[in-house]
A protein has these predicted regions:
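Canonical tetratricopeptide repeat
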Residues: 53, 87, 121, 155-158
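Alpha-helical segment of the N-proximal tetratricopeptide repeat
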Residues: 10-49, 53-60
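Helical anchoring/docking segments at protein termini
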Residues: 1-4, 10, 171-178
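Alpha-helical adaptor scaffolds
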Residues: 22, 46-111
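Structural signature of tandem alpha-helical TPR/SEL1-like repeats
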Residues: 27-39, 60-73, 94-107, 129-138, ...
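Helix-start (N-cap) detector for alpha-helical repeat units in TPR-like alpha-solenoids
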Residues: 14, 48-49, 82-83, 116-117, ...
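TPR/TPR-like (Sel1-like) alpha-helical repeat modules
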Residues: 116, 127-153, 157-164
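Structural signature of alpha-solenoid helical repeat scaffolds
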Residues: 8-9, 42, 76, 110, ...
Length: 178
């Protein structure tokens, strides 16, 4: 595919339209990103990227119901959108909807094999449910994906709790998100 053809591709155009909101989000400007992405979603309600990154911005603000709604909209437009599935799954986990979060993560694993983000999602949700053996399986597989140090240390901490080496800390369900 030539670069000219890629720019004319409707999916590429939708991605480009969402770039300003993505940049604001990456710069830590979640409120501005929300404004930008809401504007884009109103202008182009078929833009799955607007809804996905809007979900991410709401997640950053801990506005989980709004985040979930945005991720679901992205998935209505693009049912196979892995990023939106993972975002929805992490949001469900933060809302305490562990079974639904696990199902979402497993859906990603069915299509993506050993996706690190999905392994973390499923393992963390099982851990939060107290299903230690299932959590251990997924979290150990997650560590095999060579994750970033911060998340790897968090997962090592969960595994230490599972093995009985340390006691869980208060608020153990509030974990770092990918």
């Amino acid at each position: 595919m030539t670069e000219e053809r890629a720019v004319d591709d409707p999916q590429s155009k939708r991605w480009e339209a969402a770039e300003e909101g993505m940049e604001l989000l990456h710069a830590g400007e979640a409120d501005q990103a929300i404004d930008e992405l809401l504007q884009l979603a109103r202008k182009d309600p078929q833009n799955e990227y607007a809804f996905h990154f809007l979900g991410h911005a709401y997640f950053e603000k801990e506005a989980y119901p709004e985040a979930l709604k945005s991720y679901v909209e992205a998935l209505k437009l693009a049912p196979g959108y892995v990023g939106a599935m993972l975002g929805a799954g992490q949001t469900l986990r933060m809302l305490g909807e562990y079974d639904r979060a696990i199902r979402m993560g497993q859906r990603v694993l069915q299509s993506q094999g050993n996706d690190g983000d999905a392994l973390f999602l499923v393992g963390a949700a099982h851990f939060q449910k107290g299903e230690n053996q299932a959590a251990k399986r997924y979290l150990e597989r997650f560590l095999e994906t060579s994750p970033e140090l911060e998340v790897a240390l968090e997962v090592e901490g969960m595994l230490q709790v599972i093995r009985g080496e340390v006691l869980p800390f208060p608020g153990a369900e509030d974990t770092v998100e990918n």
